[in-house]
Amino acid sequence: MKIFVPGRTEIIGNHTDHQLGRVIASAVKPGMTAVCDKSAELTAWVRSDGRRPMTVDLSKLEPVKKEEGTTLALIRGMACALKKRGYTVGGFTAEVRSELRSGGGLSSSAAFCVLMGRVMSELYNGGDIDPVTLARCAQEAENIHFGKPSGLMDQLACAIGKAVYIDFATDEIIPLDCDFGSMGLTLCLTDTGGSHAGLTEDYAAIRRDMNAVSAFYGQEVLRYVNYEEFKNKGFTDASAALRAEHFFEENERVPLMREAMARGDREGCLRYMNESGRSSEQKLRNIRCTAGDDRLEKGIELSAKLLKGKGAWRVHGGGFAGCVQALVPTDYFRDYARAMDASFGLNSCCKIM
């Protein structure tokens, strides 16, 4: 049996998910494929892109400390989350082929988790495990077993397989029609070469800062903090307050972007994506990582030079490394891609929508 799971792109809603905010994300064409079958033993045998096979004993599903940060943890964690929800977990073999570079920003870990979930769904549960359940199981695998403080956006986009508007406070999940091409725009990503691997602490710091602000106002997350109270009753840590301000403003931009997409409003889409990008750079500050890798920063700067006045550009996903996302006039895309490739390597810039 062959199973495909797409990668994902975050269109708007940068670091809003873990504060129960809103986001628009979309599945993208690059993804992962597994050729799989049942096995007689209660083990998962997985070989990815021809590398050395991995074997996981599925009779032992508790988190294993030494597996944190590894693919083994994702396999075990996905099986654990499914079994906890009453689904059948059985042995399988899977040959995986991936078009998603690990740490490149298209959510390779989320796609892999969902892929493993789809394998177990198809082989042992009649393909009946719904996308939202697969996404929640994938989040649990990443958070508990892998040790990554992930939200739910990546997993939902990979599992649902199309553009989707998500409100994490209300659990509203609305599939969207996303046609930038009809607006004369091309959505693309440039992989700057930096990796998301090893950036867990940078991501965790954003979450800590936002949670510190929400706790100051007696709430668990920023979504339930009154914005007027936030503005009038100053939080003393200026750095954390800036990140909170990003959340409040970004969370209001998401439904505006959704409306602009629905009515085919080219200028609106460019405006809201640019506002999101500048807020991430200046307030959220997830462009340069603590390790000092500045390739993403250079990608943002080059995109600004190339697209100012005609397109939109922003950090993609978690940030600190990885990809620059851009909405480029379709008749200018070839020139933009050529310039980005010249700086970051052949085929580093690719059209995704």
Segments the model singles out, each with a brief description of its role:
Residues 1-22, 68-181, 307, 332-338, ...:
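Gly/Ser-rich oxyanion-binding loop with an adjacent helix/lid
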Residues 1-8, 12, 33-70, 165-314, ...:
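C-terminal nucleotide
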Residues 20-40, 160:
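Structural signature of FAD isoalloxazine-binding scaffolds in flavoprotein oxidoreductases
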Residues 24-25, 312-318:
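Short, flexible, solvent-exposed loop/turn segments with mixed acidic/basic and small polar residues
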Residues 24-26, 156, 324:
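His/acidic/aromatic-lined binding-pocket segments of jelly-roll/cupin-type domains
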Residues 318-325:
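N-terminal pre-core extensions flanking Radical SAM catalytic domains
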